[in-house]
Design a protein with these regions (language model features):
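Short, basic (Lys/Arg/His-rich) helix/loop patches that form interaction surfaces
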Residues: 152-208, 212
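Basic, alpha-helical nucleic-acid-contacting "clamp/cap" segments
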Residues: 52, 85-87, 93-142, 149-162
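N-terminal DNA-binding recognition helix of tyrosine site-specific recombinases/integrases
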Residues: 1-26, 70-73, 114-118, 153-163
Length: 228
């Protein structure tokens, strides 16, 4: 997947970033470390994170997170039967009026459904089996989907290997607020939905992509409670 093919380009790197509604801070980069705020993740950075995944399963997981802007729990529920020619069928966790959503893929991700089905065929997955399965089996001996924690770990470790980091909004094991920290899945969702709004000016499209019952404009600015 070439980042330049993505039909929805992210905000250019180096743009002023907004950590809150009152002030702006410039993106910081260095030879050893470079990091950006959530809205500053560029297609190059996203592609670097995806390429830093250590296996095909993890690369496909990161590609789906980026292409769909879906919640981690929604992506982990993906099965071979949910993969269609130009869209993916995902559960909609937060909208009781629409429990399933069709997420159409941008032109740059046109090969993603085929890649997912090849992965499923190579591993002999049944139509109802989770595509992103763990090495551990379920109580019935069947394949078990990766957990949310495992998915976050996969993306964070790939981000560290790619040396793509963001400014932390609160303290973590990676350091104090304002210190560089690895990217995480929620940032892919923020960046994708925000980028659709900015590049297309199509609020209904962003609303459908996110699976919202209404467009939450406040969601497009990351707050402290939405950081790690």
């Amino acid at each position: 997947m070439a980042a330049s093919q993505d039909s929805h380009a992210l905000v250019p790197a180096g743009r002023h970033l907004r950590l809150d509604s009152r002030r702006e801070v410039r993106t910081v980069r260095s030879a050893q470390k470079h990091w950006q705020p959530p809205e500053g993740l560029s297609p190059h950075d996203v592609q670097a994170v995806i390429e830093a995944a250590t296996c095909e399963r993890d690369r496909l997981l990161l590609r789906v997170l980026w292409a769909t802007g879906a919640r981690v729990s929604e992506v982990l529920a993906l099965r071979p039967m949910d993969v269609q020619r130009d869209h993916l069928v995902l559960p909609n966790r937060k909208n009781p009026n629409l429990t399933v959503k069709r997420v159409y893929l941008p032109a740059g991700q046109a090969d993603l459904p085929g890649a997912l089905l090849i992965w499923a065929n190579e591993h002999g997955l049944a139509p109802h089996t989770p595509l992103f399965f763990s090495r551990k089996h379920g109580p019935d001996g069947g394949l078990k989907a990766l957990s949310r924690v495992q998915a976050w770990t996969i993306l964070k470790e790939a981000s560290e290997r790619a040396d793509v980091r963001v400014l932390a909004l609160r303290a973590s094991r990676h350091g104090a607020p304002g210190e560089p920290a690895p990217a995480h899945p929620h940032l892919f969702r923020h960046a994708r939905v925000r980028q659709i709004v900015r590049s297309t000016r199509n609020s209904p499209l962003a609303q459908r992509q996110a699976g919202w019952s209404r467009l939450q404009m406040a969601y497009l600015t990351v707050g402290d409670d939405e950081a790690r």
